[in-house]
Structures are given as C-alpha cells and as structure tokens.
C-alpha cells in the first residue's frame, strides 16, 4: 500500500497487509483476546454498577478482577492471571492497537515464521514467563519503595505492543514506513528498524511524565529485553527462506536455526548513536558475565553469525562494517577514482 502527498509518503509492503487467510495461531490468539477482554469489561462494569450505589465517588479504574488481571498482592490466590493477562486490555486505544497488531502483524509474522508453535510460544509462554519476572521485580522493589502499589493491576499484555515491533525490525529492517517531505528540517525516512526504540521512548516518557506508574515501567522494559533475548538466542525456526544455508542444529531430522546471530540484531543497534558509547561497555560487561563466564547462554560460532548475516541481508539489512573495513572500502573507492581519472 502506498500513499503520497505534498507532506509525506506512506509505504507499507503488500505482504504485510495480506490478511485473506489468518493463520491458525494468530486466529486463536485474536479470538481469545477479544473474548477475554470483553469478559473483563462485563465483569468490571457489573461490579461497578453494584458498588457505585454505595459509593457514588467510586473510581471505575479501581474495579479489578484478579482472576484475569495481574494484581501483585493477589497473585498467590490467582496465579492464572499470569497467563490470562496476556489476553486482556482495559484501555480502548490499546485494544484497537493490539487488534490491528494481531490481525495484520500477527498474520505477517506467522507466515514468515511458518510456525504456529513459535507464535504460541512467543505470545503465551514468553509472555507468561515475563509476567512472572515482572511480579518478582515488583514485589522486590516494593520492599524498598512505598511508591510501588501492590493493589493496582499490572499490564500483563505488552508482548504484542512491544515484542512485535522488534520482529518487524528483524523481518523488514530497511523498509520505509513513512517519508516526511516537509518541513525540510524534519524530512526523514522512518523505517521499521526505528519502530522499537520509538515505541519504547514514547511509552517510557508517558509513564514517567503522566502516569507515574513505575511498576508498569518495569513491565515495559522487562518485556523489551525478554522479547529481544528470546529472538536473539532461543527461537528455533526452519530456514525455509534460505534452504541453501548450512545449519548446525537439527531436531527430529529437520535442520533448524537457533536465534538470530546477525550483526544488525545486536542489542546495541536498537538504540540511538548518541547513547551507544554509554551502553556498549554495559552490554559488553553483561555479555561477558552471562555468556562467557557463567555460560548461561551458548555463545554464537562464526558460522552462526555468517548464516545470520546472510539471512538479514536477504531481508534488506545493511552490512555492519567495522572502522577498519570502512577505511579499507573508502581507500578502495579513492583508488578506483584515481585509476579512472588519473
């Protein structure tokens, strides 16, 4: 789909908008999301209508259903909320965004992965494990700060809103979404590779300035790092799009690729150049501790990185060059120009 005006150009790949047949996992997750979100709305509205008669000043936002919503103080009585909260939302804007994300983005992702199992794992399993970690962090921080309230529900459904942009960046790295034409000083191509940090920046600023809900801020960033970590190190996919690639793992006689070892999918490249010098030593330290020292995660071999780079380049990602490689390329260009024009 393309749209052009004097102010901007909008370009979305046709494959991204192909929803003629919604894949099985995406269909199941979408239907479950609609049903549970509608159920939660009915439960809260019914409770509110009863309680408001006793207290006319009752705030509707304080009405909760701990069976579905992830309330830290009630989690021991209702552990089902760790899973069910992946399928609910209470804010209208988030319902609309997540439905579009699921129907359009989920269909695109599942077709590219060619695996309903991986879609279920990413949304439900990873989402639930992330919720467990978020609850643990929230309870821990509550011992040191009275600003963290344990009676307010945490949003357990950030995997779609935050995780999907990471996948879009992985599958469509250099594809331009919007090209601003005017004003000239703002003229810029907004590509899918910028979408994750744009979403994270927007949601972080919103929580800090307007909502002041710091437990939700934990949830946002934990979901971001958990989603990236799974895609980077643990996801298992058959290399259907690149059948000629060598693979180093097999499962049930089928060759598989584990994770995304490409240079462009390194965590540091998700962040702006301005803060990379600050973040690089921090990320390197964490990598050395987790991977090199304690071997919690299996490190990538050279062949894994080569395969990852080949797949990333086939998707349109630009090759990451070191300073030495850039200097060598520049020197070759200068030499060629001198040979052509002595």
Swiss-Prot record:
Pfam family, one: DUF1751
Residues exposed to the Cytoplasmic side: 1-21, 143-159, 229-342
S-S bonds: none
Keywords: Glycoprotein, Golgi apparatus, Membrane, Transmembrane, Transmembrane helix
Coiled coil (residue ranges): none
Principal subcellular localisation of the protein: Golgi
Segments traversing the membrane: 22-42, 122-142, 160-180, 208-228
Places the protein is found: Golgi apparatus membrane
InterPro entries, A to Z: TMEM115/Pdh1/Rbl19
GO cellular component terms, A-Z: COPI-coated vesicle; Golgi apparatus; Golgi membrane
Glycosylation sites noted in the Swiss-Prot or TrEMBL record: 114
One of the GO biological process terms: retrograde vesicle-mediated transport, Golgi to endoplasmic reticulum
Membrane topology qualifier: Multi-pass membrane protein
Membrane topology (Lumenal): 43-121, 181-207
Assembly with partners or alone: Homooligomer.
Primary role: May play a role in retrograde transport of proteins from the Golgi to the endoplasmic reticulum.
Anything else known: Present with 1630 molecules/cell in log phase SD medium.
Family per record: Belongs to the TMEM115 family.
PANTHER family: PLACENTAL PROTEIN 6 (PTHR13377), TRANSMEMBRANE PROTEIN 115 (PTHR13377:SF3)
Protein name, as recorded: Transmembrane protein 115 homolog
């Amino acid at each position: 789909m393309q749209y052009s005006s004097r102010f901007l150009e909008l370009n979305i790949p046709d494959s991204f908008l192909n929803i003629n047949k919604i894949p099985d996992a995406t269909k199941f997750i979408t239907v479950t999301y609609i049903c549970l979100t509608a159920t939660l709305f009915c439960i809260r509205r019914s409770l509110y209508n009863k309680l408001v008669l006793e207290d006319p000043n009752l705030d509707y936002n304080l009405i909760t259903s701990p069976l579905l919503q992830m309330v830290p103080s009630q989690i021991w009585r209702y552990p089902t909320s760790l899973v069910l909260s992946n399928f609910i939302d209470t804010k209208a804007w988030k319902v609309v965004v997540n439905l579009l994300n699921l129907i359009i983005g989920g269909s695109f992702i599942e077709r590219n992965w060619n695996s309903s199992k991986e879609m279920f794992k990413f949304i439900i399993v990873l989402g639930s494990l992330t919720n467990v970690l978020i609850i643990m962090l929230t309870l821990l921080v509550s011992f040191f700060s009275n600003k963290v309230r344990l009676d307010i529900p945490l949003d357990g459904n950030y995997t779609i809103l935050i995780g999907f942009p990471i996948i879009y960046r992985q599958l469509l790295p250099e594809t331009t979404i919007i090209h601003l034409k005017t004003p000239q000083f703002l003229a810029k191509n907004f590509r899918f590779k910028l979408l994750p940090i744009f979403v994270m920046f927007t949601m972080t600023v919103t929580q800090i300035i307007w909502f002041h809900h710091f437990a939700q801020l934990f949830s946002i960033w934990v979901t971001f790092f958990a989603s990236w970590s799974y895609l980077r190190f643990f996801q298992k996919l058959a290399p259907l799009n690149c059948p000629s690639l060598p693979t180093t793992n097999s499962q049930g006689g089928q060759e598989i690729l584990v994770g995304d070892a490409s240079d462009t999918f390194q965590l540091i490249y998700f962040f702006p150049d301005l803060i990379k010098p600050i973040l690089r030593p921090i990320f390197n330290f964490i990598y050395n501790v987790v991977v090199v020292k304690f071997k919690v995660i299996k490190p990538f071999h050279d062949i894994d990185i080569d395969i990852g780079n080949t797949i990333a380049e086939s998707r349109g990602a630009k090759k990451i060059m070191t300073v030495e490689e850039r200097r060598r390329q520049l020197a070759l260009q200068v030499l060629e120009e001198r040979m052509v024009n002595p």
